[in-house]
């Protein structure tokens, strides 16, 4: 299942609904760890790999990691970079795969970036569930119509098949460094 929300309370409630006690969760855009803390409560026997590129996240996530022990691993990195995806994919494969992909990249901004990150990461990790917090994507979905029906039952687009880690996209070089 792929769930798209905007309101932070709805996002965190969605996490409570989908995260199971032994899940492996990859969290893209953890910021200072408020949602990470909720995930750790829902998955006390699981693993959480949380990523963020902001300087504010590093200190707070180190504190949270000390509190929670080996349950949480924080990686300071830009989720748009191929090397970061490769690093996380390797870690996830060693621990048995990704159950939940959680994406919160600024909430209301850059729906194109949120979708590209979702597409590349979910195509690679093939999670059972994905939750994305982004106002632009939610607005797009509710403002759109289609006469065609294509469904995916998992947290990734099944129409992607088994492509694995996508090759480097030239388009990624065009993304704004301000994100």
Q: Which residue ranges define each predicted feature?
A:
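S-adenosyl-L-methionine
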Residues: 1-22, 56-94
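Short SAM/SAH-binding signature in class I
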Residues: 92-105
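Conserved SAM-binding motif I beta-strand of class I
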Residues: 47-52
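Gly/Ala-rich phosphate-binding loop of Rossmann-like dinucleotide-binding domains
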Residues: 40-41
